[in-house]
Each structure stands twice: as C-alpha cells, then as structure tokens.
C-alpha cells in the first residue's frame, strides 16, 4: 500500500527532515508513526499528500510512484485519501451535513449518492442527530468526529490521521480511536502520527519511531517510550 524507498528530504536551509528512510505498509494495516517534534513525522505525511517532493528516493502509494504523477493528476490521487488533522478544519458557515457533503461535491459525486452516504457516515461516527448543527455548536470531540466523517465519506483506501486526538480529553480520544479501529477492520489502511503514548501503548499495533529523520524502531506494540526519550 505504502512504500518509502531510500527516501531523503532535505530543505533549502540544509535541514535533512528525512534521511534514507525505508518503510513498507501493507494494505489494511494500522500503523502508528511516533517521535519528537521535528523527528520527521510531518514530512512523511506531506510526502504522502504530495505537498512536497523527496530530494532522493521513491514514495509509492497503491502502486503509484508519486514522483511520476503529473500536476493535473494530483487532485485525483488525493481523492483516494482521507485526512484528519488535529485542528478539525471544518467550515464554520456550513452545517455538519454540509461539511461532509462538500467533500463529495468537489469530486462531482451524484446528489443521490451524497444523500445516501452522508447520513450513513454521520451515523457511523455517532453524529446522526447533529447533522443540522454548525461546528460552533459542537464539542471538540464532536468536531473531530465530524472531521473524521468528512475524511471517510469518499471511502478512502488510505486514511492519514495527524495527531487526531491531540486536543481531546482521554474519554473522547478513546472514542476517536474506536472509530479508527472500526474503519481499519473494514479494510482501510490507517496511518496515524501521534504523541499520545497512552493510546499507542494500549493498542497492539505496529509502531514506527522516528528520530532525527531516521527510523530507529519498527515493531509491534508501543513500548517506544522506553527507548526514545523526550518524545513530547
């Protein structure tokens, strides 16, 4: 599903955000990527979203080498991805239904399919009764669930979650994780970047640890905090 082959990313200021990274993620896998700020997690996500290009090496997603994508092909590629950020990024002047529907409208999905699929995904994340509310009327946890619904409504093959529990209380964070696990069990590949050691250590998932742009650990379960210090 995802392959990084000898990937290096160096910026103009001389900083090497990634150094010779090799990583393979199988289809249907749930993967945590962890590390201190500046370790390379955000660069991995930006490369997957094709916001930046590698200085060296290949990034391959679902058999497609992203460096070979033409500019006009990038929007079509991104439609196959679901992305959830820490800061929700909901449109404040649209209802929750409209926020989720918008993700389908920009891909020109027929209205009948939108009307069928949006309520379905809102019910899945527990927001069926909040469809007509605006983001400002929702709690932080509800807003994150709305953002998750928006990311899932186009049925992505890969879901990228960048610190999705970062601003949430523990109980709400657990709710978000249960949804992510459910989505993964249905076949979606999930890649989650996080600092939440309690969440990582409570789940029997693969954990890849970055430090100074390199992978320093790749294993199952989240004992990485015993190996890499100062992760916050």
Q: How would you name each of these model-derived features?
A:
Residues 57-65, 77:
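Conserved ABC transporter NBD signature motif
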Residues 170-172:
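Helix N-cap at the start of a conserved alpha-helix in ABC-type nucleotide-binding domains
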Residues 159-162:
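Catalytic Walker B motif of ABC-type/P-loop ATPase nucleotide-binding domains
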Residues 153-157:
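A short, proline-enriched helix->beta-strand linker immediately N-terminal to the Walker B motif
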Residues 49:
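Helix-to-loop junction immediately C-terminal to a conserved catalytic motif
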Residues 94-101:
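Short coil-to-helix segment of the ABC ATPase nucleotide-binding domain corresponding to the Q-loop/switch region
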Residues 133-138, 142-144:
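Conserved ABC ATPase signature
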